[in-house]
């Protein structure tokens, strides 16, 4: 086998083979509207895992499964003791999910292995292609739990004890489908990790770029806000006498929208839930509950958004007489990816002549947890109209091939490093 990574002789993926693999996998859990439903640790998830394992073994990989059910297909390197280069994503989906979310990164990683085999290239380091268990969180909360156990964010006991709506735990379902592995979860060095994924947004498509060089994952802060006024008769209470909690919420929602735009383009400010009380058509609402979510790749900006929200809420209470309570219920720190992995992805896109741009991941991904224990990078390709978590989710064969070619070059470069 060759062991050089000379740019002129770099291998390319077989785009037709990759697309055929994606189409075949999409038959598992296919929905009438063209999407997929493969909830984590269902029989359909098992079927998708079984197919991946078969393909990986056909490509000469050895397969191991850890105690969280994460599946690792290893292509051997010249030095079996060297820390591996890791790539992959997830195979589970939303209930009405798309055909490419997650699985594109898994099968893109498998195509890297196949392309290296086709070219007869022996890498210095092993290459691992991984399926992470329960990335979506649609059946078992929280999302990305198995990558979280791998990176030490959660304990193994916590991960295995997560339950679905019927009370079935991850541990029980892993046993049921035959993917309760014996391998320890994590605890070993990884030289570099790359995750290939659809963007799940419209930035790349609107910018006319084929590749997104992901520089970071956004931090998140979630809040619950309760405003308290006075229930009152809608017909007998003059406007000047009202303490309307819903009107106060409307003012806050408008402020939050303006606040998010003030910190554009990277900020996201969302009110996703609202509940007026008593929720009667002829009663002035005396109570209102709503949620706020902020996202940004810089913790300092998240602090500013937090301070602005609290200040405006205090101002509202002072001016209207409404009671106001705010509770921060979740925080997730921004995740900067490794500069050397970012540079490797960018250089790969440039060497292939592909249009590209730096981008921040608006969604959470397994790579955001892996980045805590290994140098990590991500590669995005566009998706049509930015749709994801939707049965209409779509990418083109050309985008799929381009992203996998970038992944191939990034993995090969890292796998040849001493």
Language-model features: where?
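Alpha-helical metal-binding/catalytic segments enriched in His/Glu/Asp
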Residues: 25, 87-90, 96-136, 221-227, ...
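Midchain, well-structured core segments that form catalytic/ion-binding scaffolds
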Residues: 92, 134-135, 139-300
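Flexible, glycine/charged-enriched surface loops at secondary-structure junctions
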Residues: 64-66, 122-126, 181-185, 236, ...
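Zn-dependent metallopeptidase/amidohydrolase metal-coordination segment
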Residues: 18, 24-31, 88-89, 286, ...
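Short beta-alpha connecting loops at secondary-structure transitions
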Residues: 156-158, 295-299, 329-331, 386-397
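A short beta-alpha structural unit
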Residues: 40, 270-279, 291-297, 323-342, ...
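Acidic/His- and Gly-rich active-site-bordering loop/insert found
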Residues: 12-98
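Active-site-adjacent substrate-binding region
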Residues: 12, 19, 27-31, 167-215, ...
